[in-house]
Amino acid sequence: MSKISLLDCTLRDGGYINNWEFGTETISETKRLLEEAGVDILELGFLRNEPYQNGRTVFNSVDQVKALIGNKRPGMQYAVMAEVANPFPLEMLEPADDQGPDIIRVIVWKTKRNSQGFEVDALQEGFLYCKGIVEKGYRLCVQPARVDQYSEEEFVAMVERFAELDPMAVYVVDSWGTQNPEDLLRYMRFADRHMPAHISLGYHGHNNMMQAMSTAQVMMKENFRRDMILDASVYGIGRGAGNLNLELIGKYMDEQLGTDYDIDPMLEIYERYVKDIYDMEPWGY
């Protein structure tokens, strides 16, 4: 059976709720507790070309990310996210090393509006940006936003194009949480058929139709010929209706797959930090 990994995006996607202003204690303790929980990949925030603010999970240098990482937990990988629509300049990106993030995940869009207001292709721009990330020595995860925009032919062409960069993973991203499991599985199968088997397949869902958990369960039972990565966050904290709940999918994987995620630290994050954020700015269906 292929390996299924858990990526926690609490400090990154969760930041859409509070403008990434978690505070220094919440950030450091959330990181520590997620390390205790044993998630496979820990996403720490965004790389953006904007002023850095202490206590906020938006970074404008790799050195700031390194300071948060500190001593890496053996066997765990650390990630940050960048966006082609608001790119962190590649000339400001330090080459990868053992102390910094292992992975940079890049949000790419199918189209964009040009200066005249016309919709134009954006994938070539995304490809070149991702190519620059790889050339700096980072592992790349390609996050094509809103897969529902793509026809089968367009999606396959996109997957084959980005596979040329030999990324760690290409994702199926349900940006607005509007796709049912059958639709998302269709895109997953397209990707599975058209990528080399060593490239992982990722799923990033939102819970607008209360289907993030059921979709993840369906995908886990599919006989893909590659490893998978599932994105999740504590109590589903994230944009809109929120994400796949880390504590729920972790418990399910422990029971069904024999993984060894520790759920108690995830619940501690909720009790100490996420609950207060939810009380001020709730998310969910």
Where do the language-model regions lie?
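Catalytic cores and adjacent flexible loops of soluble metabolic enzymes
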Residues: 1-285
